[in-house]
Amino acid sequence: MNKKEERASLIYHSKPKPGKIAVVPTKSYNSQRDLALAYSPGVAVPCKEIEKEENNVYKYTNKGNLVAVISNGTAVLGLGDIGPNASKPVMEGKGLLFKIFADIDVFDLSLIHI
């Protein structure tokens, strides 16, 4: 990659907002009622329904359309052992591909060894 394309890549990953993926609400949050339904006390109702019938988790949550992309950064896409923080752009890129090609939501996790 030439210097011009390297610079373009850095700008792409940092502007206007750093990263390539985000968590966005799927429900309204414009009122106190919306927030009460989204969290407490309203969230208890679907929790109880899931407790009664475990498969309800797919009815009331995003579980059926959510994956985790996890790396500790030790074997990254031809880059080798670059560490968890340096692997984050690759994990976000995988998340972006899942979203645009399959409409699957992703949480990317970069794990640090302790």
Give, region by region, the residue ranges found by the protein language model:
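A common structural microfeature
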Residues: 32, 44-47, 64-67, 73, ...
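Solvent-exposed alpha-helices and their adjacent loops that cap or buttress functional pockets
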Residues: 15, 57-63, 70, 99-100
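Conserved small/polar residues in nucleotide/adenosyl-binding loops
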Residues: 112-114
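Gly-rich Lys/Arg/Thr-decorated short loops/hinges at beta-loop-alpha junctions or inter-strand turns
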Residues: 30-31, 71-80, 98-108
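An N-cap/entry alpha-helix motif that binds or orients negatively charged groups
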Residues: 17-59
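Short, glycine/charged-enriched hinge/interface segments at domain edges or termini
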Residues: 51-66, 79, 92
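Glycine- and acidic-residue-enriched helix-capping/strand-helix junction motifs
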Residues: 77-91
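Extended, charged alpha/beta regions that create polyanion-binding interfaces
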Residues: 2-3, 13-20, 25-28, 90, ...
